[in-house]
Amino acid sequence: MVMLWALISCAEISAQEIQKVSNDSIALQEVVVKAARVVNKEDGKLIFPSDIQKQRSFSGFSLLGKLALPHIRVDEAGRSISATDNKGEVQIRINGILANMHDVQMLDVASIMSVDYIDSPGVRYGKNIAYVIDIHTRRASSGGSLGFNLTNALTTKLGSNDVYASVNRGKSQLNILYEQTYVDNKASEYNEDAQYLLHDGSEYQISRKIMNGATQNYGNTLQLKYNLADSALYVFQTTLTTDFCNQPYTSNEMWFSESGKPAYPVYRTSKGRDFTPALDLYFYHQLGKHQSLSADVLGTYIHTKGAYYEGEGEPYQYQVDGKTYSLIAEAIYENRLKPFTFSAGTNLNWKYMDNQYLGDVVSENGIRSLGIYGFAQIKGSLGQFKEGTSRLTYVAGFGLSNQSYRQGDEEFSFWLCRPKLTLAYSLTSSFQIRLGSELSQHISQIAMISDTRIRKNSMEWTVGNPSLKPNSIYENWVVFSFSKPRINTDFTLNYRINRHCNLAKYTRTENDQFLYSQTNQPHCNMLYLTNDTRFDIIPDHLILSVNAGIYRFFNKGDEYSHCYTAYNYSGTLQGYWGKWTVMLYADNGWNFMEGENIGHNPPSLATSASYHIGDFDFTLYMHNPFMAHPKSYSAEIVNALLRKQVRGYDNSGGNLLRIGVAWNINRGKEYRKIQRNINNEERETGILK
C-alpha cells in the first residue's frame, strides 16, 4: 500500500482554472482539455472526456463506455446501461432532462462538454435511482445531422438498427428517430431441480428440463422531438414517442419427471404484444440572473395483450388484456445564492391500471395509485484551493412523500420523510473524504399488490398481496477518493438497512399447493466494501479500469435467518491506436442473496474492435468467446418448504459475434451551451405473470 501511494504521489498534476458556476455543474474557463479530467464532487464526479475519446466514439454509448464510470456497465452492442451492484436504476439525462436510450444513441459526441456522474443522488431525484449520468452538451444553432447505426449478429438472429436525423435552425431543433429490434432464439436451455416438503412429512422431487427453448420478439420505436430554446432565458421541448412490441411466441418443450416416475414431455407457450404512446412536455424559464423555474408533464398509455399456456399436470391457460394510464407532473424552483444554491419542488404521479384476466384466471384488476412528493435542498461549498476546487462541500435536503393505493375494498396511504445529508472534505486538491446518510422509500412492483392468483406450474402459484406496504431504506456510506491525471481510485464502505421490507413468502396449502407471495418482513440488510480504480497506462492510448467488492447480506424473515457473502469483480482494458479502438471486458458475474433467494449472474467476457474511417465506423463484437454453452443465470431457493436449484443456458450467446456499421454526417453546425433540469418516465403495467 505504501508503494502504491508513493507511485500515485509521483504522478504530475496540471492545474486548470475551474470555477463553480452552479449547483450542479463546474465549467472550465477557456481551457482545452486534452486528457480525461476528473473533478471529485460532493455527490460524485465531473468528468471531461478527452479529445481522443470523443473522436473515437460514434454514439453516447461508445463514449460512456470509454469513461469507465464506477459501478456502471455500458453494453454498446446491446444499447443498454445498468448498475453492476444492482442498487437501483441508472438515470440518464442530457443537459438535466431525462433521456432514453434512443437519445443516447443519436447523441452528437462532438457537442459533449462534460459528464456529471452522480453516485449519491439528492432528494430532488426520483425513487429507486442509484446513479445519475448527466451529459452536458453544447446546442447546435445551425446545420443538421443524418445517420444510422446497424448492429446485427452473425451467429444468431439478433439485432438492433436505427436511423435518425436532426435539423437545427436558430432557436429551433427537430429530431426524428426510428429503431427496429429483433430476437429469434431457438437455442435456450433450462434445468430445474425442486424438492417440496409435503404435509405428511415426505419429500416430493421434481425435475424440469428444457432443451430447445424458442423465443421471438420484435420491437419498433418512433420518436419525434421538437426543441425551442434561448439558452439564456428559456427552453421548451415536446417529445412524442411510440413503442410497439410483438412477441409472436415463446415455446418450450419441457421434460418433466417426478419422484420414482419416468420423464415425459409437457409444453409451455406464451405470446403477447404491447403498444405504448407517450407525450412529454417540458419548460424551463430563467428568472433573472440567479433563479429558474422548470416544469415537466408526461402522459403515457400502455395497452398490453397476452396469452399463456402451461401443460404441467392439468392444462392451465389464461389471457390478459391490460390498459394503463399514467400522468407524471413535476415542478422545480432553483435559486443560486452566493453561499449556497437552494432548490425546492414537487412531483405528482397518478396511475390507473385496468388488467382483465380471462380463462383459468378470472380477475378484473383495477388499481389506482397516487404519489405526491415535495422536497427542499441546499447545496454549497466552503473554502477553496488555489486552483479553484472547493475544500468543503455539502448537500442537505429533506423530502416528504405520500403513496396511496386503492383496489376494490383494499386501500392504504403511506407517509415517509426523506432526509439526506452528504459532506465532502478535500484534504488536498487530489484527496477527498465523503460521508453520507439517507432515509428513502422502496415501493414494491404494483403487480405484487394485485388481488390476482396465477399458476406457475403444477405445484406452485404466484399470489398478489393487496396489504403489501412500502418500506423505508436507511443508508450510510463513506468514500475515500484520490485523483491524479493518470489515476483515479475510490474506496467505498456502505451499509444499507431495509426494515419491514418486501420479501418472498412461501406457504403450503392443505392439498400441497405451494404459494409464492411477498409480505413485509423484518429486514434485508447489505454491507459492502468496494474499490474502483482507473489507470491510464499509456495516456490517450491504453487505459485499465478495475472494480472489486466484498458484499455481506443479512436476511431476517418471519421464519428464517440467512447470511451470505459474495465477491464481485470486473475489469476493462481499452486501447487506441491510429484509427483502431480495442476493448476487452471481463467480470465474475453478480452474486447476491435476498430473503431466501440466492442469485448468481454468470461470468461475462466480451471484446470489441472498431475502425473509424471518414463518416463511417465499423465494429466487431465478440461475447463469450470459446464458450459453446454459456450459462445465462442460476438461482437457488433455500426455503424450509421448498428448495430449488435453477440453471439457464443460452447456446446462441456462446461465441456470439456481432458486427456494427455506423454512419453519421454533421453539416454546418455551430454550438452554444444549454441547461435543463427535470426527468420523468413511465413503463409499469401492473400485470402479474
What is each PLM-predicted segment?
Residues 17-53, 77-78:
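Short, acidic, small-residue-rich periplasmic hinge/interaction motif at the N-terminus
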Residues 73-120:
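Periplasmic plug
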Residues 412, 429-431, 441-492, 497, ...:
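Outer-membrane beta-barrel signature, preferentially recognizing the C-terminal barrel domain
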Residues 150-154, 169, 180-184, 240-246, ...:
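Transmembrane beta-strands of outer-membrane beta-barrel pores
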Residues 20, 30, 60-65, 79-82, ...:
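N-terminal periplasmic accessory domains that precede
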Residues 219-247, 268-410, 414-416, 426, ...:
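Face-selective signature of the C-terminal outer-membrane beta-barrel domain
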Residues 613-689:
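C-terminal beta-signal and adjacent terminal beta-strands/loops
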Residues 126-133, 141-190, 217-220:
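Outer-membrane beta-barrel translocator/receptor signature
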